[in-house]
């Protein structure tokens, strides 16, 4: 078995790129891509390092997308091995970012090297959109690169995001879409006072409770064949001074929608406002638009991905839209077809994160086969 993917994955993991740091990961990738004819364009926005690398100037444009940043390691005492000293144990590569997503990055680079060596005159173009701001606030990462590309009319046809999509074995699941995400920050106003004199106060918790109950019980839509019904979840509630004898003067509630293509953010916002107003609440509310829902249905990218997975691994893949958000949400609105395909996600963001070495080698072969199907 070739050790190319393993070696590069280890080199990437050894760089402690806790978000928003890159710690030299992108230059490492860039050096190898430049040797294969890629034009390397670093894009640094404030604290975030991004890279746009492209080989070719014609369409269609296939883009590998991913991130070099990783989440913090947590309690070091719970790690069996140092998180930034990658080691292989019983066939698994251990280290922070092994599964999310430095194993995928290594597979992308090696797959591209192999493809270009075999098909130097391939049709279209290949690109890499890499950021160090996926695990963080996602302000200066992929979204800023996409803005730059849009401004110069550089259009991505197909994008493969290397997020760890697999559940039990490599390729059993690919993400061909994601739900939208909308966060609300609600402040319900009241009048602070002594609990013994409620007539002199106005308890915002009591006032808000019926409205919150209605929001929690509301059926927002029925979903569809690609998306489950929209979900409303209260994430945080804060009210009171900590004392048992004080009626609070305000209540703060943070909630989130994960919504399907059956509704829009604007529809959800209006329905929330209607409920709050119907309960006569005095409130302030602000909204954070985390991402629109997107879906890549049957077409060249999804078809090539399903075929490649089966041909390399023998697995019949299941396209799904479940899970959290990814940077695919910033790429899809440009009109690109977007799918996510990466290794098993069982240990992502956990202590002792690891990935099966055989899986990232197989992943490189799948990525290469996808390139062959689309650009040969």
Curated annotation (Swiss-Prot):
Cofactor(s) needed for function: Zn(2+); Co(2+)
Catalytic residues (positions): 69, 134 (proton acceptor)
Top-level taxon of origin: Bacteria
An example Gene Ontology molecular-function term: acetylornithine deacetylase activity
Pathway info: Amino-acid biosynthesis; L-lysine biosynthesis via DAP pathway; LL-2,6-diaminopimelate from (S)-tetrahydrodipicolinate (succinylase route): step 3/3
Pfam families: M20_dimer, Peptidase_M20
Binding site for Zn(2+) 2: 100, 135, 349
Cofactor binding description: Binds 2 Zn(2+) or Co(2+) ions per subunit.
Any one biological process term the GO annotation gives: lysine biosynthetic process via diaminopimelate
Catalysed reactions, as listed in the record: N-succinyl-(2S,6S)-2,6-diaminopimelate + H2O = (2S,6S)-2,6-diaminopimelate + succinate
Major enzyme class: hydrolase
Role, per record: Catalyzes the hydrolysis of N-succinyl-L,L-diaminopimelic acid (SDAP), forming succinate and LL-2,6-diaminopimelate (DAP), an intermediate involved in the bacterial biosynthesis of lysine and meso-diaminopimelic acid, an essential component of bacterial cell walls.
HAMAP family: DapE (MF_01690)
Similarity annotation: Belongs to the peptidase M20A family. DapE subfamily.
Protein name: Succinyl-diaminopimelate desuccinylase 1
Upper lineage: Bacteria, Pseudomonadati, Pseudomonadota, Gammaproteobacteria, Alteromonadales
The gene coding this protein: dapE1
